[in-house]
Amino acid sequence: MTSLQMPKVDKSVLSNKDKIASDLNKILKSENILSHEDEIRPYETDALAAYKQKPLLVVLPETVEQVSEILQYCNENKIKVVPRGAGTGLSGGALPLADCVLLSMGKFNKILEIDYQNKCIVTQPCVTNLAITHAVQDKKFYYA
């Protein structure tokens, strides 16, 4: 078995942490930007706990427009972004990087549409399996 190879850390991004946080504060309220060790620790891994790495910053957008502005800023400044839903994934898809902005979609937790006839549900990224089950159980449906 080979070891996990993560992308190389961009030291210039690490050294600009305060500026990046300040710039992102033009998009988000300060309480929606996490940078202190104890604040970001819960985000150092998803349910796949074999690999742990604290991100540079965690951002908690509340609107689609904020997500768009964060992505535009990070793209223009060549800052890696790792999106994260509920953090329950087991495949490592939301593993943070030391030089990334972790884009927590935790505030996007609404069920948008339930189509019982076609057995289809449209949700925001942070809706849990249990929330879906609770939403459909009165119609005798169950979701994972």
Identify the residue ranges that each predicted region occupies.
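N-terminal accessory segments
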Residues: 1-47, 76-79
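N-terminal glycine-rich flavin-associated loop
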Residues: 12, 24, 49-81, 99, ...
